[in-house]
């Protein structure tokens, strides 16, 4: 009961600031129709309840499933079996990610199924790389430098229309379905190792899996022509209470089907392991089943609320604010929204909990949340600046990733892994359903190119936490070094006091 209250409090605290900001803007500088405002408020209630169910469900089901599958995979003691299972697992959970369908629709020149399978194969391939890294204790930083180097070299030859969507894909595909399972898989596999670095190596799976989709879409950009254009989504308005209710009720069956299709492959995969290898006790299995039900209900409510309530509000607010005499208000407003919106990402709480547990509280959830919020605030501010000025996204991504990769030389390894994991976690469904429509609405209002200038918000949100969390790691390292120096000082002072005495004189004293 206490845990439910805590989860409910977290969910309310995550969404209320966003609700307050939107209401404040609606009643002051950005007038919004009553219909869209009501849709947003009802959507916020759906999101709060959905977050509550999802956070409880992920803790009860997705995390223990991932850990046990990871441990079970290693029992085969055959590397090729482990890697083959890892690849198929990566493909299955990526295809099951709801946001991947949205991404596919954003690239009109590439057939949907080609893009989905390519991205899924990219995640599968890099999950194999991540598993090899854990099994052989390979450092994460050099891998990141090499793979991001390859990405930016390929990006040089890809049409501009593909760049923003390609980098967005890395954040979109590591969503609420993928993150809890992949992170738990890493914990399960690293637990087999007994060396002191095993705990640190359990992080970094999401970081590497985020690279696969980016590479996949960039490679598709070399093959397919950059044709097609962005088509603005209709903003539905309800003219009475019945129509308002229908907007939500019509979407619920769609997401019931969508999330069922997303969860079933993971449940099927786990079921095979349960029958062949894991064989959990009935009580544990029932708990996991209840957790899966919570996860299912939570994601259905969350995505219904976010898509029906948040997308129209974000799009409309962006359009209105960009049409004001001073459209630059978008930059500070975007930063404030970005600061608070990351708290409403479902997978963020999964990451924070795991970090606190594995570091024995040395890295607190609060410090991590503040670092994430600061990073996302900066990224949304820069994204709004791009919308208003049309600055190419690579002018931000190349220096940003260069700084992030440079910091890996000085930061404790665990902070590097957590930082690059957090990039994929921070850029979840809230970014896709509120921040991206905000940018699209603003871009349309100023007459910009939506494909080049508005898309890329997810990529920016995924990038800045890499820097802010590593800066947190640098501060942590400096403080730890100072503590060690202070602990050694009294001992050194005692040695200085007795330095002039002979051994027998010290004994007499």
Show which residues each predicted segment covers:
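Transmembrane helix-loop boundary segments of multi-pass membrane transporters
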Residues: 38-39, 57, 104-116, 134-149, ...
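Transmembrane helix-loop junctions in multi-pass membrane proteins
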Residues: 24-38, 58-67, 92-107, 126-137, ...
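Helix-loop-helix junctions within the multi-pass membrane cores of secondary transporters/permeases
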Residues: 70-72, 79-150, 327-408
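Juxtamembrane and boundary regions of transmembrane helices in multi-pass small-molecule transporters
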Residues: 130-145, 160-161, 193-238, 384-399, ...
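Transmembrane helical segments that form the transport core of multi-pass membrane transport proteins
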Residues: 236-347
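Alpha-helical transmembrane segments and their helix-start/interface "positive-inside/aromatic belt" motifs
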Residues: 8-14, 38-44, 72-80, 140-145, ...
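Hydrophobic core segments of alpha-helical transmembrane domains in multi-pass membrane transport
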Residues: 16-29, 43-53, 85-92, 122-133, ...
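Intrinsically disordered, low-complexity non-transmembrane regions of multi-pass membrane transporters
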Residues: 1-11, 15, 66-80, 194-205, ...
């Amino acid at each position: 009961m206490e845990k439910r209250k805590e989860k409910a409090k977290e969910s309310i605290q995550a969404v209320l600031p966003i609700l307050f900001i939107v209401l404040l803007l609606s009643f002051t500088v950005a007038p919004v129709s009553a219909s869209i405002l009501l849709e947003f408020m009802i959507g916020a209630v759906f999101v709060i309840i959905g977050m509550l169910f999802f956070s409880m469900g992920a803790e009860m089901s997705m995390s223990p499933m991932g850990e046990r599958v990871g441990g079970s995979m290693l029992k085969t003691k055959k590397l090729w079996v482990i890697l083959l299972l890892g690849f198929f697992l990566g493909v299955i959970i990526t295809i099951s990610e709801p946001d991947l369908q949205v991404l596919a629709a954003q690239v009109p020149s590439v057939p949907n199924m080609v893009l989905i399978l390519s991205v899924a194969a990219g995640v599968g391939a890099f999950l194999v790389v991540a598993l090899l890294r854990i099994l052989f204790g390979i450092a994460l930083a050099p891998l990141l430098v090499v793979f991001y180097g390859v990405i930016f070299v390929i990006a040089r030859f890809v049409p501009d229309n593909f760049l923003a969507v390609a980098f967005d894909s890395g954040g979109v595909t590591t969503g609420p379905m993928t993150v809890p399972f992949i992170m738990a898989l890493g914990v399960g596999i690293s637990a087999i190792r007994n060396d002191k670095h095993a705990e640190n190596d359990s992080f970094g799976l999401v970081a590497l899996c985020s690279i696969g989709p980016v590479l996949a879409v960039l490679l598709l950009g070399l093959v397919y022509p950059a044709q097609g254009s962005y088509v603005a989504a209709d903003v539905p308005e309800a003219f009475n209470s019945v129509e308002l209710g229908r907007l939500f009720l019509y979407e619920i069956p769609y997401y019931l089907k969508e999330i069922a299709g997303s969860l079933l492959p993971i449940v099927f995969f786990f079921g095979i392991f349960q029958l062949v290898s894991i064989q959990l006790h009935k009580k544990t299995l029932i708990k996991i089943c209840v957790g899966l039900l919570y996860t299912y209900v939570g994601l259905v409510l969350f995505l219904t609320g976010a898509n029906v309530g948040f997308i129209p509000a974000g799009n409309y607010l962006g359009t209105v604010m960009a049409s004001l005499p001073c459209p630059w208000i978008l930059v500070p407003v975007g930063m404030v929204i970005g600061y608070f919106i990351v708290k409403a990402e479902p997978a963020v709480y999964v990451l924070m909990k795991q970090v606190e547990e594995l570091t024995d509280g040395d890295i607190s959830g609060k410090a991590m949340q503040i670092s994430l919020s600061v990073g996302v605030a900066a990224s949304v501010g820069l994204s709004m600046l791009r919308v208003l000025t049309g600055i190419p996204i690579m002018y931000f991504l190349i220096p940003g990733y260069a700084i992030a990769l440079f910091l890996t030389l000085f930061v404790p390894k665990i902070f590097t892994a957590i930082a690059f994991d957090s990039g994929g976690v921070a850029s979840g469904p809230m970014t896709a359903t509120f921040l991206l429509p905000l940018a699209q609405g603003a871009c349309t209002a100023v007459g910009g190119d939506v494909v080049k200038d508005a898309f890329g918000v997810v990529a920016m949100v995924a990038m800045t936490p890499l820097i802010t969390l590593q800066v947190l790691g640098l501060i942590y390292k400096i403080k730890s070094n100072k503590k060690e120096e202070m602990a050694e000082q009294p001992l050194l002072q005692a040695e200085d006091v007795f330095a002039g005495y002979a051994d027998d004189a010290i004994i007499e004293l």
